[in-house]
Amino acid sequence: MRLIAQEAPLGCAIACAASLADLSYKETRRYFDDGEIKEQTSGFYNRDIVNVLNKVGIRTKAYGIKRRGNRKIKFSSIVFIGRCPKYPAGHYLLKTTNGWTNPWLNYPYINPIKAGFQKRLSGGARWIIEIIK
C-alpha cells in the first residue's frame, strides 16, 4: 500500500481507496461517480467506496459500529470516524501494519496536504469497510 494524500477537502475516501487498491489518487477518482464534484462539495458514503473497490477487483463489505469504541479492526480496513471538532465532516482512515494511514495528517493546513501514519484512531469508528476473503 502506498501513502496517498487527499487532493481535495472531502477526498479522504478517494485517498484511502487509492492506497488500498495501489492506484493513484486521480486514477481512483475516475471510478467514483461524480468524484471531481463530490470531493469538493458533499464527500462520499461507504457504498461509494465499496462500489469503487469492487470495480477494481477488491471485494469489500461495509457495516456500522453500534456502540462507541474501536473493536478489533482488521488490517486493510477503511474506517469512518464521525464528526468531531478536528474533522467536522468526519474522516476516513486506513488501517495498516504501520498504523493508521491518515490522508490529511496535517489538517487543517492545505498547502500542501500531507498524508502520514498515526498510532491511534482520532475518534471513534462509526463505519468499517473491510475486505471479504
Say what each PLM segment does.
Residues 1-41, 46-51, 55-58, 133:
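Active-site nucleophile-adjacent alpha helix/oxyanion-hole segment immediately C-terminal to the catalytic cysteine
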Residues 32-124, 130:
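Conserved active-site-adjacent core of cysteine acyl-enzyme catalytic domains
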